[in-house]
């Protein structure tokens, strides 16, 4: 009997493979970093072959290190950095260019043009998304417009487009498909009809033949090529990283929310089978689709994402050089009692939700001769929490409800100073689970449900366990004053490049 689910977790800076047992516990991990490519200011790319090679290597490595074979694996679940765009040749399987990463801003001016033409409402109504260069649609158009002969080849059906999940499924199995959660991040998918939208494709001049088939997030979608692992393994779960994390956090009921502190920060609120249209610059997105045919049920989410979360700490390490390791930031920040009046707005790539300002830029305010690197480190950590306050406030307005708790995960959730400040500034309890690898766990759960490795969402919920609960301890007056100062600082950072 197969004892494990293999989760493939393809992230912005690394590829990982994680084995989970029946109890939802980690049995083995393998990870390999790969480089980002920055050809021009505001451009961010990946070598799609480097992604595939690293992902295959870690999948094989985790099996080898744990003395397992393909027959020990019940299924594979895939979770991935979303929106990142790959176009490849259907015959050769080779990309026609580097992948354009979700962080890439090269199509910002084109998005401005579409907004000026009055197209923003149409896109929001159909896709639930704001018209921003963050999403895949404008990246696909850019590649078709700028890579020689790409559009003609696409129209002849020679090329395939996919987000990273599609690319991995294609390399693993030869199938060209995606799931509803990833499709909902493209600006091309109607989240109400659950179909690629012809009107939106026409605006971008994207041939429908380029697009993958859309399948459920939980269900046997394909099987791996025999030669990769020695025997075929079912690919039975697919979800974008943030949707997978929400599922892994057992936020299965409407009103439950989670925040993932990764490269960026992403907060999702489950709204059940009802797609709530945001009036506060949030995204309405598909969380997951379970079941097939008439039994299929799609869950929707409100989402807010900020571009700079843990990446701020990386900048403190690599850009400023004030820490040697990312883990050192907590000790440095706690070496001072407060931020000394320093406020940090980390708008290095603009501001995400709820501002959506591509032209904002990073700002450090309140510096005096008494300011030092510890104050900057503390202000940097606090900026992650402040951005998350803006997200939850907007969500509660849209959902017309108050959250009773916020479940957290991702690398920075291990930082107790940040988590306590997050609870204080939100005035909501923050709960960290025992397993913080919830993105990979969510992909594993989706795959496991499809092959009856787990029987139900209720069984998964019963496995979720709390590690630590952070209760708010800040006075209302202090909270109000701090938030007022934060919003003043955001105003200074906005529209800097316009």
UniProtKB/Swiss-Prot annotation:
EC number in record: 2.7.1.30
GO annotation, biological process: glycerol catabolic process; glycerol metabolic process; glycerol-3-phosphate metabolic process
Keyword Cytoplasm part of the UniProt annotation: no
One Pfam short name: FGGY_N
Ligand binding (sn-glycerol 3-phosphate): 12, 82-83, 134, 241
InterPro entries, alphabetized: ATPase_NBD, Carb_kinase_FGGY, Carb_kinase_FGGY_CS, FGGY_C, FGGY_N, Glycerol_kin
Activity regulation details: Inhibited by fructose 1,6-bisphosphate (FBP).
Keyword ATP-binding: yes
GO function terms (MF aspect): ATP binding; glycerol kinase activity
Binding, ATP: 12-14, 263, 310, 314, 411
Binding-site positions, ADP: 12, 16, 263, 310, 411, 415
Keywords per UniProt: ATP-binding, Glycerol metabolism, Kinase, Nucleotide-binding, Transferase
Binding residue positions for glycerol: 82-83, 134, 241-242
Pathway(s): Polyol metabolism; glycerol degradation via glycerol kinase pathway; sn-glycerol 3-phosphate from glycerol: step 1/1
Function: Key enzyme in the regulation of glycerol uptake and metabolism. Catalyzes the phosphorylation of glycerol to yield sn-glycerol 3-phosphate.
Family: Belongs to the FGGY kinase family.
Protein name listed in UniProt: Glycerol kinase
Lineage: Bacteria, Pseudomonadati, Pseudomonadota, Betaproteobacteria, Burkholderiales
Gene name tied to this protein: glpK
């Amino acid at each position: 009997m197969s004892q494990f689910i293999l989760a493939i977790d393809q992230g912005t800076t690394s590829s990982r493979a994680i084995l989970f047992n029946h109890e939802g516990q980690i049995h083995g991990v393998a990870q390999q970093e790969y480089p980002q490519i920055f050809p021009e200011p505001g451009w961010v790319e990946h070598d799609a072959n480097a992604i595939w090679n690293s992902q295959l290597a870690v999948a094989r490595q985790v099996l080898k290190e744990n003395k397992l074979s393909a027959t020990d694996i019940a299924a594979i679940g895939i979770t991935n950095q979303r929106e990142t765009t790959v176009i490849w040749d259907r015959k050769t399987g080779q990309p026609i260019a580097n992948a354009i990463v979700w962080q890439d801003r090269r199509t910002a001016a084109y998005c401005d043009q579409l907004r000026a033409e009055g197209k923003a409402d149409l896109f929001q109504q159909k896709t639930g998304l704001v018209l921003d260069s963050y999403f895949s649609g404008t990246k696909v158009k850019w590649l078709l417009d700028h890579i020689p002969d790409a559009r003609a080849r696409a129209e002849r059906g020679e090329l395939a487009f996919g987000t990273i999940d599609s690319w991995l499924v294609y390399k693993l199995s030869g199938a060209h498909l995606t799931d509803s959660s990833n499709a909902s991040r493209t600006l091309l998918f109607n989240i109400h009809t659950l179909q690629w939208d012809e009107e939106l494709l026409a605006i971008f001049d994207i041939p429908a033949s380029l697009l993958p088939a859309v399948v459920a997030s939980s269900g046997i979608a394909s099987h791996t090529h025999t030669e990769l692992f020695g025997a075929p393994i079912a690919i039975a779960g697919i979800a974008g990283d943030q949707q997978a994390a929400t599922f892994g956090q057992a936020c299965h009921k409407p009103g439950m929310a989670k925040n993932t502190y990764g490269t960026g920060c992403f907060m999702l609120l489950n709204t059940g089978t009802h797609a709530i249209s945001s009036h506060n610059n949030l995204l309405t997105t598909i969380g997951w689709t379970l079941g097939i045919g008439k039994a299929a049920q799609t869950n929707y989410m409100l989402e807010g994402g900020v571009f700079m979360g843990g990446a701020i700490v990386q900048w403190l390490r690599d850009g400023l050089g004030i820490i040697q390791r990312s883990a050192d930031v907590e000790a440095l920040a706690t070496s001072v009692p407060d931020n000394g009046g320093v406020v940090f707005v980390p708008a290095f790539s603009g501001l995400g939700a709820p501002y959506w300002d591509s032209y904002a830029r990073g700002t450090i305010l309140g510096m005096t001769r008494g300011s030092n690197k510890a104050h900057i480190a503390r202000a940097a950590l606090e900026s992650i929490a402040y951005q998350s306050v803006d997200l939850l406030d907007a969500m509660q307005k849209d959902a017309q409800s108050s959250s009773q708790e916020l479940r957290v995960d991702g690398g920075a959730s291990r930082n107790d100073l940040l988590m306590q400040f997050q609870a204080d500034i939100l005035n909501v309890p923050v709960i960290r689970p025992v397993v913080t690898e919830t993105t990979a766990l969510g992909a594993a759960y989706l795959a496991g449900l499809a092959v009856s490795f787990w029987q139900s969402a209720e069984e998964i919920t019963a496995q979720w366990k709390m590690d630590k609960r952070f209760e708010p301890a800040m006075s209302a007056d202090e909270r109000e004053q701090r938030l007022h100062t934060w919003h003043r600082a955001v105003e200074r950072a906005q529209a800097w490049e316009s």
